[in-house]
């Protein structure tokens, strides 16, 4: 169990607001960008250049594919979902993925290692520790500001010769043909481009055998094609901020289950924690309105003093919590990944890591199809991807939703069962290893390694 992460940044354009539905004109298309009457034909079009879409584009390009990325929000704008104040709890497998994409060195400067996780229930006697020693690694994961990840990805996207990066840009008029999918990309009024010739063009047509939607859970193009991920609200939101404490964290994260939802503290720097506090909506309104001193007092009362005395909170933000998945992640020549395909509760830090594995899996399937000279967007290729991700998506969704329902049950008998379970887990190393392997995505990475080994 990774510890709760902030809700996945590629799913929301800002606090309690949807992400941009369709991206808005090329930031750095190649100097020989086509005229509006001459479609440019990359191998894959990626709608959404945030964390998951950016990772997908780099993974595709690393294997030789030509990629066009269309992102709505200006890269440096506060509205950019990949550049907000949330934190990510990355698994060690995510670190390896980013290292393979050539961006981990930039991210690592901002990363704090999670060495162990303390899990407990407020007011209960059961508790357990999960340690990197349980799985023999250097760390269970890493806490990273989403802004650092987004900036590293965007720098690499602009540098990569195989990537045509349209940002800020809008994608409209998507048409799914028998042999290709086409979309019109319009440059925003304040967009910048790589050349004066490109700057003079307001619209360009992209055509490719495959289009990937990575533009979040409220994707307009997703609703028109494969359908949006059906989401069920938890009637909760996550309040996120960073607090100081009078104790060094020493790499320890906390997952504390309370009567209204999990409360997580993630090691942020030497004496700071990133806070992810699941709150019922009525309580969230009141907590957001508190003064800093009163908020710290409320947080201390909810969590206790195991992590020390809290002080000096940063600005708070809130994000709605929900779960669900698209009935079908793929349609004719279109596939959705990340929050465009599924939404999970941030408990156990699964959301972004799940979307990142979507990106790597799709890139691996496309790479295999290219080696075999197959149509990248044919039904068989998309079915292969959907089957590759079906089991893990369902497993992670059931796991995170199950945790919330089990720990949200206030019946005395269930409380006793929970505390016995936590206490029993503490003395069962095989169960710890199993839990950690599942939450770190080890099974999915094994499947992807097998696919890569078929090259």
Positions of PLM-derived features:
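Extreme N-terminal leader/targeting segments of oxidoreductases
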Residues: 1-44, 59-63
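Conserved N-terminal helical subregion
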Residues: 40, 110-224, 232-237, 292, ...
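N-terminal Rossmann-like FAD-binding beta1-loop-alpha1 element of flavoenzymes
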Residues: 43-69
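Glycine-rich FAD pyrophosphate-binding loop
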Residues: 61-83
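N-terminal FAD cofactor-binding segment of flavoenzymes
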Residues: 82-122
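Conserved FAD-binding catalytic core of PHBH/FMO-like flavoproteins
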Residues: 98, 188-189, 198-205, 210-316, ...
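FAD/FMN-dependent oxidoreductases across multiple families
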Residues: 285-372, 376-377
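C-terminal helical "tail/cap" subdomain of flavin- and related membrane-associated enzymes
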Residues: 364-455
């Amino acid at each position: 169990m990774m510890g709760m992460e902030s809700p996945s940044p590629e799913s929301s354009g800002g606090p309690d607001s949807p992400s941009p539905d369709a991206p808005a004109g090329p930031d750095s298309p190649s100097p020989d960008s086509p005229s509006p009457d001459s479609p440019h034909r990359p191998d894959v079009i990626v709608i959404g250049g945030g964390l998951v879409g950016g990772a997908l584009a780099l993974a595709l390009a690393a294997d030789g594919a030509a990629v066009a990325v269309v992102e709505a929000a200006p890269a440096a704008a506060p509205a950019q979902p990949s550049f907000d104040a949330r934190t990510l709890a990355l698994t060690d497998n995510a670190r390896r993925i980013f290292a393979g994409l050539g961006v981990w060195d930039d991210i690592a400067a901002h990363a704090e290692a999670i060495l162990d996780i303390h899990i407990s229930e407020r007011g209960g006697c059961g508790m357990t520790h999960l340690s990197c020693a349980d799985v023999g690694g250097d760390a269970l994961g890493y806490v990273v500001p989403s802004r650092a990840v987004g900036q590293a990805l965007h720098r690499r996207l602009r540098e990569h010769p195989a990537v045509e990066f349209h940002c800020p840009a809008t994608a409209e008029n998507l048409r799914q043909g028998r042999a290709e999918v086409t979309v019109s990309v319009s440059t925003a009024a304040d967009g910048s481009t790589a050349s004066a010739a490109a700057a003079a063009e307001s619209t360009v047509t992209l055509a490719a055998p495959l289009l990937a939607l990575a533009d979040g859970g409220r994707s307009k193009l997703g609703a028109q094609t494969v359908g949006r991920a059906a989401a069920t609200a938890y009637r909760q939101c996550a309040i996120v901020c960073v607090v100081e404490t009078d104790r060094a964290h020493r790499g320890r994260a906390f997952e504390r289950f309370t009567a209204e939802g999990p409360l997580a503290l993630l090691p942020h720097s030497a004496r700071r924690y990133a806070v992810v506090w699941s709150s019922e909506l009525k309580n969230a309104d009141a907590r957001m309105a508190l003064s800093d001193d009163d908020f710290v007092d409320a947080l201390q009362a909810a969590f206790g003093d195991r992590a020390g005395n809290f002080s000096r909170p940063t600005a708070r933000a809130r994000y709605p919590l929900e779960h669900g998945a698209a009935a079908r992640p793929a349609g004719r020549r279109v596939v959705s990944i990340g929050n465009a395909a599924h939404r999970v509760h941030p408990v156990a830090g699964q959301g972004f890591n799940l979307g990142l594995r979507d990106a790597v899996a799709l890139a691996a399937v496309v790479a295999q199809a290219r080696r075999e000279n197959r149509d990248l967007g044919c039904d068989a290729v998309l079915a292969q991807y959907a089957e590759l991700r079906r089991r893990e998506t369902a497993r992670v969704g059931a796991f995170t939703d199950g945790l919330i329902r089990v720990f949200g049950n206030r019946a005395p008998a269930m409380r006793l069962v929970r505390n016995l379970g936590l206490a029993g887990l503490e003395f069962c190393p095989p169960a710890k290893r199993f839990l950690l392997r599942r939450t770190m995505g080890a099974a999915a990475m094994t499947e992807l390694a097998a696919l890569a080994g078929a090259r």
